[in-house]
Amino acid sequence: MSALSPSPPPPAPIDPAALRLVLFGMSDAGKSSLLGALAQAAETQARALHGHLNDPAHGLEELRKKLYDDRQTETQQEIVPYPVRFSPYGQPSIPAVLYDCDGKAANELLTQKRPMENREGTLAGAVLNADGLILAVDASAPHSQ
């Protein structure tokens, strides 16, 4: 995970019907920053989102605070789940889990240094069970990356 990800929130029960989205990318690609920006937009720009993003475990809120207060911490978690619920205006709410991942773990999966095993709590398991992957790429990274 990037150096900006906080310690994971206490495990919250994850709705089995939740949409599962994994932010996948190398270290410093901006995965945590995207989640922090989403939390900021949810707090200040609900109209632009056309709904309300509920963060029951307050994990995104903590991440946003760390990002905007510039309190960076290194974490060793392979994945950090952020359970949320999006309530579009006039529509039923949608449960989702946003997974932030460790860039080193992503690199190890891509270079096949880590097996693609479907185990709970691993990046491989999150990827294999995801409804969608959001690929974050650092455009300023060298081409060799």
Annotate the PLM regions.
Residues L98-Y99, A136:
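Structural recognition of the conserved hydrophobic beta-strand(s) that form the central parallel beta-sheet
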Residues S2-L98, K104:
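Conserved G1/Walker A P-loop phosphate-binding module
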Residues E108-H143:
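Inter-motif core of Ras-like GTPase G domains
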